[in-house]
Amino acid sequence: MSDYKLLDRCLCCDSKNIDMLLNLNEQPLANSYHEEDEVLKSYPLAVNLCNECYHIQLTHAVNPDLLFKDYLYVSGTTQTLKDNMKWFVEYVQKDTSYTKGNSVLDIACNDGTQLDYFKEAGFDTYGIDPAENLYELSSKNHNVICDYFNSDTIGNKVFDVIVAQNVFAHNSNPKDFLDSCEKIMHDESVLYIQTSQAEMVMNNQFDTIYHEHVSFFNVNSMNQLVKRTNLNLVDVTKTPVHGTSYLFKITKNKISELGLLNHLEEEKAQGLYDEKTYELYKKNVINIVYNFRDFIDKFKIAGYSLVGYGAAAKGMTFLNLADVKLDCIIDDNELKQHLYTPGTNIVIKPNGFLKQYKEDDKLLFIPLAWNFYNEIRERILKTRDNKNDVFLKYFPKVRTESR
């Protein structure tokens, strides 16, 4: 496989009626944190909109080996995610005919944190993930395969529950993904697929557009995709994690679709199935980038140091598009610390680095992992007590908050 391939049909409804929505220029891979002098390759980063089902997808899909074999994102570093994982296990127990010893497969199990909570609840835990650097962590207490998920790699075992959290959108062939899931489901099995940024368009968010995220689903596009398989989309829930996420419930048997129908009507009322909504979204994205640059310039002139918090992939997209250089970025993930950000070459430091600033230094904090804003703010305030510090937020519009 070459480094990337063109996606010329809608991945959900298979239509060729797709048009460019946003072009974020060529950018390096968002999670390619590197040593200071390393030169990175850039790849096309743009999204098309399907004019039939309103699915948003990348124009090009990068070879997954370049993205996931050595993966520096770990899910167990934030309390917000851990709390959501605990909630999710309880949700699954209540939503299924759970009995102790039920089997669960976590597709893209990362460092195994979600599986840890399933194991605590009495599930037999299985995982699969291609990240070779995380295998020792994920396989410590669980049955884990270090590979990509497909019907060949997972074998013939059938599972009671299958979980795909924030991995389904990474796949450039989601229909094949669903077909592979069907082969390892029995009649009562439940597949839960979580996709992030359910309110991306309504809140003018664009920073989650990076090469790992091939697709940006709405309820209609997911429904059209599932209809092309032997499975059934039976319910949809919205959860607050990752800036509001969809949690899709998919089964072999067709059951009540009331929740699904309600969400379809809700999104239609919001304008998500109207081309005018996406024209406005495009204009708002441009305005946010220009306003962000203006705010940054004003604070630099006023003598503020510019400190990002959370070297999240979404932040890399934002900074590269805005072409803004910060003084440093703080991140609590040890795997990223002392490396440099892709494209902007900003050094990543641990939280303790903040103590090197004097008490009367003025800092402008930009929480790049804005989906963990409250947690980030709390960590900063525990480290610094300076009333002149300011927090900059940029969705759904650019604005500041005082300490």
State where each predicted segment sits.
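Short, glycine-/aromatic-enriched active-site segment of Class I SAM-dependent methyltransferases
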Residues: 193-215, 219-221
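Conserved beta-strand signature within the Rossmann-like core of class I S-adenosyl-L-methionine
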Residues: 188-196, 390-393
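Conserved SAM-binding strand-loop segment of SAM-dependent methyltransferases
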Residues: 140-152, 348-349
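N-terminal juxtadomain amphipathic helix
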Residues: 2-80, 237
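A conserved beta-strand element that flanks and buttresses the S-adenosyl-L-methionine
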Residues: 163
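Hydrophobic, well-ordered beta-alpha structural blocks that scaffold small-molecule cofactor pockets
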Residues: 92, 254-403
